[in-house]
Amino acid sequence: MPKYEIMTILDPKAEMAIIDNLLKTVFGDNSTEKLRKLETTNLAYPIRKSKIAQYFLVELNAPTNLIEEFVRRANITREIWRYLIVNLDSEKGLNKKPKIRERNRKYTPRRDRFDKPNFRGNPKSRFDQQDQQATKNQQNFQQNQQNQTSQYRENSRQNQDDFQQVSSNQQNFRQNQQNQSGYHRENNRQNQENIHQNNKNHQNQTSQTQRSRRQYQPIKNPKFNQKEKENYNNKKPQSSN
């Protein structure tokens, strides 16, 4: 079973029980025997506007599927900011300090002033070149991942803004339709009232005209005698010749 070393960075306000419970849940109760808190608290760059955090280091033996489960749970735990998993069977651990090698000071004779200096650099071995190329490839890969992540976030934000704009336009369109419907209903009601009022006025005028006609119409009395007719004719103004 491979041996792993897990470094976790927690929120400075979080408790140690969070990482302790996570390790026990994934790897078992005996997984926290070598769990220890490091003295380092400073961050190389701010995380969530904080420059300090808690560092925890643990060594354990676990299969690959449990490591994947730990990664999944760590990603959904808000208090865990960062984590790093090192396979000690293939890589050097984080708590292993390099040995200080003593350099033998060799006596180099003083160069004569007439000798030409040797400006040729030290030739690099094939393994050093491969290590440098691997480091460069890893840096390029990390840079590409960061660029893709930033591009994905930017596209997501742009899509969210577009969705909000479309929703706002739909709401405005529905509001305009409601306003237009209300305006048309009000106009139709007003027109109907005007038509009704005009009809009523026309009826009043017609009835008034009929009453005036009946008032000034001469009375035709069949029993109108001759004497009254003469009196009526005498009252008429005489036309001048």
Curated annotation (Swiss-Prot):
Region (Disordered): 97-187, 199-241
InterPro entries per the UniProt record, alphabetical: Ribosomal_bS6, Ribosomal_bS6_sf, Ribosomal_S6_plastid/chlpt, Transl_elong_EF1B/ribsomal_bS6
Short name of any one Pfam family annotated for the protein: Ribosomal_S6
Gene Ontology molecular function, alphabetical: rRNA binding; structural constituent of ribosome
Keywords, alphabetical: Ribonucleoprotein, Ribosomal protein, RNA-binding, rRNA-binding
Species this protein is from: Mesomycoplasma hyopneumoniae (strain 7448) (Mycoplasma hyopneumoniae)
Coiled-coil intervals: none
Positions with biased composition (Low complexity): 130-151, 161-180, 199-210
Record field: transmembrane: none
Compositionally skewed regions (Basic and acidic residues) per UniProt: 109-118
UniProt function note: Binds together with bS18 to 16S ribosomal RNA.
Official protein name in the record: Small ribosomal subunit protein bS6
Protein family membership: Belongs to the bacterial ribosomal protein bS6 family.
GO biological process per UniProt: translation
GO cellular component: ribonucleoprotein complex; ribosome
